Amino acid sequence: MHLIKKIVLLIFTVPILSKNLMAAELIMVEQQGCYYCEEWKDQLGHIYPKTPEGKYAPLKTFDITEVDEIKGLERDVIFTPTFILMEKNKELGRLEGYSSEDFFWELLEVILEKETEYTAPKVIKTIN
């Protein structure tokens, strides 16, 4: 009986672990003294992990001097900040620079929906 329980547990655990291992992540490449990197961190850094996008693609930061540690980049990182959507060591898309909160969210959502199974939550606007 114990063997059956272990097999059932294994059957249900492996897909969950596999899904987590294949999760997307958003890599932010920054550098010391980067004004727009600081702007992003001040405006969005504290809320990003709480958003649907942040839960789907958790943020991992690298200094531009550490960019060689990132496996699977399609091209060099020239600008900071650069946000790179990665999955299984493969670059899916990138955003170079940061100009505003609205612009960032809109572009990130487009990349996530196009390149992954992410579906953005629908916002219902009401008129008062």
Q: Where do the language-model regions lie?
A:
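Non-globular targeting/processing and membrane-anchoring segments
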Residues: 22-24, 76, 92, 96-128
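A short, hydrophobic beta-strand/beta-hairpin element that forms part of a small beta-sheet core
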Residues: 79-94
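Bacterial N-terminal signal peptides that target proteins for export
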Residues: 1-8
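Cleaved targeting-peptide boundary
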Residues: 21-32
